[in-house]
Amino acid sequence: MTSMQAIPDITATPAWDALRRHHDEIGATHLRQFFADNPNRGRELVITVGDLYIDYSKHRITHDTVQLLVDLARAANLEQRRDQMLAGVHVNTSENRSVLHTALRLPRDTELIVDGQNVVQDVHAVLDVMGDFTDRLRSGEWTGATGKRINTVVNIGIGGSDLGPVMVYQALRHYADAGISARFVSNIDPADLTAKLSDLEPGTTLFIVASKTFSTLETLTNATAARRWLTDALGEAAVSKHFVAVSTNKRLVKDFGINTANMFGFWEWVGGRYSVDSAIGLSLMAVVGRESFADFLSGFHIVDQHFQNAPLESNAPVLLGLIGLWYSDFLGAQSRAVLPYSNDLARFAAYLQQLTMESNGKSTRADGTPVTTNTGEIYWGETGTNGQHAFYQLLHQGTRLVPADFIGFSQPIDDLPTVDGIGSMHDLLMSNFFAQTQVLAFGKTAEEIAAEGTPAEVVPHKVMPGNRPTTSILANRLTPSVLGQLIALYEHQVFTEGVIWGIDSFDQWGVELGKKQAEALLPVITGNASPAQQLDSSTDTLVRRYRTERGRTS
């Protein structure tokens, strides 16, 4: 398909009309009633994918809903579009590119020919170079300019070059086994870099500059400041021993002073928000090693295969994406909460924000026509039980419908005894997981509360309406493979929703104009230049106030 081909309006299809009628029939039905009608739904509406046990029974759906949603997916040619993406067809139509993040985790002995090239060979060639480099780093064979071992890698990137590595580093911290830690710098606010470097020793620090073009403003600004910090301490000759690059621009990498032999490449068919399993993960491989990184990739591939081969009716990412669309377009939900009951997944919701919202936050379809329905779920969240003491009040008794994904693990990597010295803190954590999904679903009625002797005037305040939908995702333990499975589960949900909405989930034109405006305003803010075009009164006043407070003429 090219960007010029018209895309049928999914809201004008019989499948959409059937779902609308179905919503009229069951939209007001409470989860209490769904479970009363079918007490076994908690054992029926479940899927196991790899190490993930996914319970979607606490959603406001029936078996009929699932079938109608699958019919909608087929009306949107989801299976054909999925196969096209996996085969390397240019499904990113606005940029005329393949979308092949799934190729990053294909086994070495497979083959995928795209534009005459076996991309699997290319991927594993880079993985081999990454592995050889990180082996040297981890063993101490690679030393800094002073001869000392590297004990800290600082990843400088932004967006997909930062959010993924930050999240995975925290999630897999227990797998760090070579005495190397990582820090991550992304914000152009100088406070970020200053804080990250404040207690580091230049001689034991390695910088990874992650920028495909090696021209990203924030990344190059931070990298230049980091370079100055290093050379002030160790001299210019130290740059080649303390800087490596993840990029495709050899000329600019060389000009920066980085030996291009220490440049790790990737491809235009890897979007930033889908790149954590590419060379963008170099900092992670340095910390956890090539074997754990390979396990991470294998987890992605498990879910990729399921997404490719499982029937839509039992395809986990497809069903979860369809359920998200059900809430967004038929029940009026605007956001989805992601609630990991694992402190190691503290950055998972922030990672998913970019993955989902940059992908599907579009108002124009791939053929250039306006969308005719809501798109782009708003993702947000916090770890349990922290969120319970912050925003769960709104989830339980507020007026907004917020479907939530609960993620938990049976076996903790860390555990401690409870106050009595006997119980498990992890058991206490997970008892909250199960209790919250139960109360969100079933609530507590006024009659039940009154029967407990609650004063009549207090009863309305204690009613828990329930009927708040959740997905429960359980795994045995948070391992590299399980983390890869979780990420791929959400990647393919994004694709599913994007296909049905008819949008291009793999471009991000909405972030470009603000960058250009910032470039135009910088000389106005810092010097005496006049703006290229008349500023609106608000921006003009703000700029003048800023200049005055910076000691510049207004």
Curated annotation (Swiss-Prot):
Catalyzed chemical reaction(s): alpha-D-glucose 6-phosphate = beta-D-fructose 6-phosphate
Pathway annotation from the record: Carbohydrate biosynthesis; gluconeogenesis; Carbohydrate degradation; glycolysis; D-glyceraldehyde 3-phosphate and glycerone phosphate from D-glucose: step 2/4
EC number: 5.3.1.9
Stored InterPro entries: G6P_Isomerase, G6P_Isomerase_C, Phosphoglucose_isomerase_CS, SIS_dom_sf, SIS_PGI_1, SIS_PGI_2
Pfam families per UniProt: PGI
Free-text function comment from the UniProt entry: Catalyzes the reversible isomerization of glucose-6-phosphate to fructose-6-phosphate.
Protein's name in the database: Glucose-6-phosphate isomerase
Taxonomic classification: Bacteria, Bacillati, Actinomycetota, Actinomycetes, Mycobacteriales
